């Protein structure tokens, strides 16, 4: 049993963490203070009257109203993450056998959520494959038309705002316009955008937005947000016949503990940091420009419109063939320099993000990688 005692994290706090799924989830000091107050089990339920979204101490009810305004949506509910939000929407508004039309870069959880809800999936393909993997957004019309011509019902349109593979930002307005023309509900998966960059739900004509607290809103896992328009409120918030105060799709209550507290405590920090998105893009583009000088090749759309970067790295792969550490040399060399978050043993392609780092740290990372390549050649 000793292995469960005194747990520590091997990626220490002193390391610069480049993992794209973690850069947006780093807690500010305000949230760390809240952890101490609320780390016990059902601590948010001290003054609960039956439903999480109506709790006023801590101010969960106010927070959900504020987050809805922040996203320019009508309503919001806490979830355990974006994946749970997607399933809630699919289960609440679609009928078994309906089709979900989604982009080819959609996260695996979009497919799994549809499968769990007993729905079918139709993909919208690429305008271009390698190296940009840009989605053909106008292709949504064609896919929907083809399905309808075959007598199939499309219950939901889903667009991945930014995908987790290439970091491509999709023009949600285009798909929102198509959704309105077709009269089909539109879900925007903002796991990589809400909390990192500005998102305006009504501007892009989204009926639903799902967000990830732990991925992009400086919160502890698992937590997220489902924001939705008033038009679909009755379906999303339908209550149980036997337990009338409990919302069915939320199974009564969702993120009922420390994660939602960190989400709230980080909210003022998040509101301010999205205003600095242009500066984050400058850092990202600087990294791309500098590392392409030494043989890296950025995959995905150029110039970068999001902080998640995927590189082809043939120069690292060539070094790995000669180095006795093989593919682990790059991870080892980064670790020596206080840098983590890059997958160990992988040298053909890497993903990274410098979101939220100071310029001095960004320059340090770039110079460290250049030094590694030069010294290990």
From Swiss-Prot:
It holds the Pfam family SepSecS. GO terms for biological process: translation. Pyridoxal 5'-phosphate binds at residues 82-83, 189, 212-214. It catalyses: O-phospho-L-seryl-tRNA(Cys) + hydrogen sulfide + H(+) = L-cysteinyl-tRNA(Cys) + phosphate. Its cofactor is pyridoxal 5'-phosphate. The keyword Protein biosynthesis applies. The modification N6-(pyridoxal phosphate)lysine is found at residue 215. Homodimer. Interacts with SepRS. Converts O-phospho-L-seryl-tRNA(Cys) (Sep-tRNA(Cys)) to L-cysteinyl-tRNA(Cys) (Cys-tRNA(Cys)). This is O-phospho-L-seryl-tRNA:Cys-tRNA synthase.
């Amino acid at each position: 049993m000793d292995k469960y005692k005194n747990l520590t994290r091997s990626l220490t706090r002193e390391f610069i963490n480049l993992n794209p799924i973690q850069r947006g989830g780093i807690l500010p000091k305000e949230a760390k203070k809240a952890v101490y107050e609320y780390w016990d089990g059902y601590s948010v339920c001290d003054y609960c009257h039956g439903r999480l979204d109506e709790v006023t101490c801590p101010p969960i009810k106010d927070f959900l109203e504020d987050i809805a305004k922040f996203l320019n949506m009508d309503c919001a509910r806490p979830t355990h993450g974006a994946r749970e939000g997607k399933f809630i929407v699919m289960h609440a508004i679609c009928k078994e056998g309906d089709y979900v039309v989604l982009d080819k870069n959609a996260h695996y959880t979009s497919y799994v959520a549809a499968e769990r809800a007993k729905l079918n999936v139709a993909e919208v393909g690429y305008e271009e494959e390698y190296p940009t993997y840009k989605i053909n957004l106008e292709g949504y019309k064609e896919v929907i038309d083809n399905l309808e011509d075959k007598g199939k019902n499309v219950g939901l349109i889903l667009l991945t705002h930014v995908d987790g593979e290439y970091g491509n930002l999709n023009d949600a307005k285009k798909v929102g316009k198509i959704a309105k023309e077709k009269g089909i509900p539109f879900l925007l998966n903002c796991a990589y955008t809400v909390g990192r960059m500005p998102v305006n739900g009504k501007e892009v004509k989204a009926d639903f937005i799902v967000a990830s607290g732990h991925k992009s809103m400086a919160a502890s896992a698992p937590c997220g947000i489902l924001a939705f328009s008033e038009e679909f409120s009755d379906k999303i918030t339908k209550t149980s016949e036997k337990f009338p105060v409990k919302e069915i799709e939320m199974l009564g209550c969702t993120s009922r503990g420390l994660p939602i507290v960190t989400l709230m405590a980080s909210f003022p920090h998040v509101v301010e940091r999205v205003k600095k998105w242009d500066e984050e893009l400058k850092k990202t583009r600087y990294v791309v420009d500098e590392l392409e000088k030494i043989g890296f090749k950025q995959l995905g759309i150029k110039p970068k419109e999001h902080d998640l970067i995927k590189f082809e790295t043939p120069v690292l792969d060539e070094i790995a063939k000669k180095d006795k550490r093989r593919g682990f040399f790059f991870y080892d060399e980064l670790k020596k320099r206080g840098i983590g978050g890059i997958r160990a043993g992988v040298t053909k392609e890497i993903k990274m993000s410098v979101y939220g780092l100071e310029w001095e740290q960004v320059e340090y990372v770039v110079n460290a990688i250049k030094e590694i390549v030069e010294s290990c050649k």
